[in-house]
Amino acid sequence: MKWYLWGAVVLLYSLFGSACSTEWRYDLSAYGLSPVENVDNAPAMARALEQIREKCEENQTIVVTLPKGRYEFYPDSAAERVYFISNHDQMNPKKVGLPFEGMKNMVFDGQGSELIFHGRMLPVSLLDSRNCVLKNFSIDFKHPQISQVKVVENDTVNGGITFEVAPWVHYEIRDSVFVAKGEGWELTPGSGIAFEGDTRHLVYNTSDIPVGVRGLIEVSPRLIKSPRWKDNRLVPGTVIAMRSWERPAPGVFLYHDVNTTLENIKVHYAEGMGLLAQMSENITLDGFSVCLKGADDPRYFTTQADATHFSACKGAIISKNGLYEGMMDDAINVHGTYLKVVRRVNDSTLVGRYMHPQSYGFEWGRVGDSVQFIHSSTMELIGARNRITAIKAVDQPDYRGAKEFEIRFENTVNPSIHEGSGFGIENLEWTPTVLFSDNLIRNNRARGSLFSTPRQTVVENNVFDHTSGTAILLCGDCNGWFETGACRNVLIRKNKFINSLTNMFQFTNAIISIYPEIPDLASQRKYFHSDIVIDANEFITFDRPLVYAKSVDGLVFTNNIVKQNKEYPAFHWNNYRFYFQRVIHSKIENNYFDEGFIRERDVLEENNGYDI
């Protein structure tokens, strides 16, 4: 089989090479880009990329180079675009620093450059492009919207916390309220994440904390007393990232692309996700990181949300050799989006709606796409698969900005599917295979990784180090986030889990949490997830729960090593190594537990009368 694969690679290489026999090189310094401090490179970059795009042809490769340096970009003169981006606030228009659009066979090489952005911007976008590589640069913002402070004193007797504001944070105390400020924005933080000052781990059993930003007394510049802030867990030296819940734009945005590689890119901050890819095919991340600037970086945080996020993509997603740390959500999230059925027009036509306020306005499906239908209360499939023969936006001229689509199907839709009982439509065409390997995930909020795709998913050779919540989540939800779908082929092998689950967040029932949202589990007769193998991993943990699973047909846990420590007190409500709800065809064999394994003590099975 390897010889066949190698032959296919050689054939593809020869075809691609013959199609792109001419190489054109463009040095962006010739277009006026300058690494001089306070020089705005946004207009020159926009002009350069537009001129280069016009020269893209099928039979040539374009290499665009940026001489190594520190380049600044300001929003006022940047390219302006209307983008509807999955899982982000739909704030438009957006100011884009590097708008790559309509590119073919293009390599952008930053040669180690630092790209520094001001205000609120979308740093890099790649749209409607094919066979493109972005590599060798970093993304950061001059004034992040997250305000970092350090606890100097905590009066646990009388109450009140005194904190020091990091030197790069612009702020004022306005009518005794902390107001963070930047170019074109200001906000008062509403929540915070607490980090241990010496280790950078999230503080044990804190999760999202309220922050004392009102009724303040400024003792001296950058030294502030908050008399009402009472939290004994925040000892002096604790570093707190005070934040809002806004996420206007990611660091990198991919849309309608085919065959994209992101290589040796570091995102140090973005107000949304590090990378958001939607409706794109075949994406490779190699050395793409959302990370600090090394061990001496005074910052403790990176992105406001997920490090990487893939919504309604297809082909292969490969993510390897990355470092993900300090972000406020998952290192990777792969899913599609259910449309909720809001009207049955006739027996072959339905109207479906995007339901989450951060997920609408982008293309959902195309003629010929295969779909299936699901009952949201039980998450069971209803009727047979079908195929789209026509799709149009209902509330907009086209899909841009649309929330509702009228969809005509090839065959009659099951008569039980209508607007009254909660049904979702899942697009099966836009579902990828996933390889997530050789990554380091550490010191982040929420979860380490999240996968919701029916195609093969392999998670291997990763280190999940103090991910604070669940390390791996297999989800599926047609009720809140409306993120598809069922996992049918998952292999989790040769990973190392170090003290995950020091905090509680959504869906964090164990280190590996298989947690579809099923409101009426008691009425479910089928199973949502299937064929999940957890093999040859090492778990180093202070607490009990290893695997939680709900509605699974086929779960294997073999050849794993479990080591117990006392680095934190056990606190999780789940006291079982394995907690199964409606799980059949499960196997737990050939594992090593340094404290032993007793099935009656370590396994809880709730199957509602179904056989195990």
Swiss-Prot record:
Its main location: membrane. A lipid is attached at residue 20 (S-diacylglycerol cysteine). PbH1 repeats lie at residues 431-453, 454-476, 487-536. Its EC number is 3.2.1.n1, 3.2.1.n2, 3.2.1.22. It is an enzyme of class 3 (hydrolase). Pfam families: Beta-barrel_GLAA-B_I (PF23763), Beta-barrel_GLAA-B_II (PF23764). GO terms for cellular component: plasma membrane. It catalyses: Hydrolysis of terminal, non-reducing branched (1->3)-alpha-D-galactosidic residues, producing free D-galactose; Hydrolysis of terminal, non-reducing linear (1->3)-alpha-D-galactosidic residues, producing free D-galactose; Hydrolysis of terminal, non-reducing alpha-D-galactose residues in alpha-D-galactosides, including galactose oligosaccharides, galactomannans and galactolipids. Residues 1-19 form the signal peptide. Keywords: Cell membrane, Glycosidase, Hydrolase, Lipoprotein, Membrane, Palmitate, Repeat, Signal. A lipid is attached at residue 20 (N-palmitoyl cysteine). One of its GO terms (molecular function) is alpha-galactosidase activity. It is found in: Cell membrane. Alpha-galactosidase. Removes both branched alpha-1,3-linked galactose residues of blood group B antigens and linear alpha-1,3-linked galactose structures. Belongs to the glycosyl hydrolase 110 family. B subfamily. This is Alpha-1,3-galactosidase B. The gene is glaB.
